[in-house]
A protein has these predicted regions:
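Transmembrane beta-strands of outer-membrane beta-barrel pores
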Residues: 41-47, 89, 100-106, 134-140, ...
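Outer-membrane beta-barrel translocator/channel fold
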Residues: 42-58, 135-185, 270-285
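Outer-envelope beta-barrel architecture signal
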Residues: 29-37, 79, 92-94, 126-130, ...
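Residues on the lipid-exposed face of transmembrane beta-strands in outer-membrane beta-barrel proteins
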Residues: 37, 83-87, 118-122, 164-170, ...
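Outer-membrane beta-barrel initiation region
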Residues: 24-95
Length: 285
């Protein structure tokens, strides 16, 4: 089964927090400690039959009357903290850091914006800048134990993701950027399709499991048009290697990001298109 999606996002960030928007921020020449904390408020909307809540923000209805029912639209407003503390070894152009990343913050991608990274950056002459980090999402994300439960109150369960991120910026002194992200997704209680009203066999229930691994590869080119405008086209490939064959999918994505510098502010607009194909047909539909 093939699925396509088009999404757009607009974010506005303060100038003091957006000086570094590359996959790997510039490493200072001087040794020592550095860091910053930026506070913001994010607002948006969510339509999902899988997500229950993000932190204290409810994102879905705990009861549905039909499997064909469209997901309700939920508006959300939540604080966003973008921070980093780092220690730099100036002589070797090495930096150790803990925090979340400015590039994710400006992409306005809720999933990656909330990730916290513990990592190391290394600048290598004529090669580029490389970043390796361990990533986790400290804010609890709850999903429905059985999202296919009809005319009953659906219970929620916590979903966690941990993984590794590797970035290579200014590849061979060009303006190309490469990223690979590998994650493991776990649920405390996975009960998809277990309702007796569905009449699914155990084998069919296993096809609906949402746990497993996700690999995402992205290649960008940072085109500096002039002092105020930058255009960043990109191509990506995502492989959802989930335990349920009906939930596993893979496919390619196209991205186009425009950055407009307004002095102390920077306006970021992002357009994405993704086309993915599932391994198996969902046994319910």
């Amino acid at each position: 089964m093939s699925k396509s999606g088009l999404s757009a996002a607009i974010a506005l960030g303060l100038g003091f927090c957006v000086s570094a928007v590359h996959a790997v921020p510039t490493i200072p020449e001087a040794s020592g400690w550095s860091g910053h904390v930026n506070l913001a408020v994010g607002a948006g909307g969510s339509e999902s039959n899988m997500l229950a809540s993000l932190g204290s923000v409810d994102l879905g209805d705990d009861r549905i009357s039909s499997l064909d029912e469209d997901a309700g639209s939920e508006d959300l407003v939540m604080p966003i903290v973008q921070f980093e503390v780092a220690y730099t070894l100036g002589d070797s152009a090495t930096q150790f850091y803990l925090g979340n990343q400015v590039a994710d913050y400006l992409n306005f991608d809720l999933e990656t914006t909330l990730e916290t990274h513990l990592g190391i950056r290394q600048a290598i002459p004529d090669i580029g800048a490389v970043d390796f980090s361990l990533a986790t999402t400290p804010l609890a994300t709850d999903v429905w134990k059985d999202p296919y439960l009809v005319d009953q109150r659906r219970g929620d369960t916590e979903r966690t993701s941990t993984g590794v991120k590797i970035s290579w910026d200014d590849i061979l002194s060009t303006r190309f950027e490469f990223e690979w992200v590998g994650k493991e997704i776990e649920l405390d209680d996975e009960e998809s399709g277990t309702s007796s009203s569905l009449g699914l066999s155990r084998a069919q229930q296993r096809q609906l499991r949402r746990t497993g691994d996700v690999d995402r590869f992205t290649l960008h080119y940072d085109w500096q048009i002039n002092e105020r405008h930058r255009l960043v086209p990109g191509i990506g490939y995502t492989d959802y290697q989930l335990d349920g064959d009906a939930m596993a999918e893979d496919g390619f994505a196209l991205h186009l990001k425009h950055l407009y510098d307004l002095g102390r502010w920077r306006l970021v607009t992002k357009l994405s298109y993704e086309d993915v194909e599932s391994d198996e047909i969902n046994p319910i539909y």
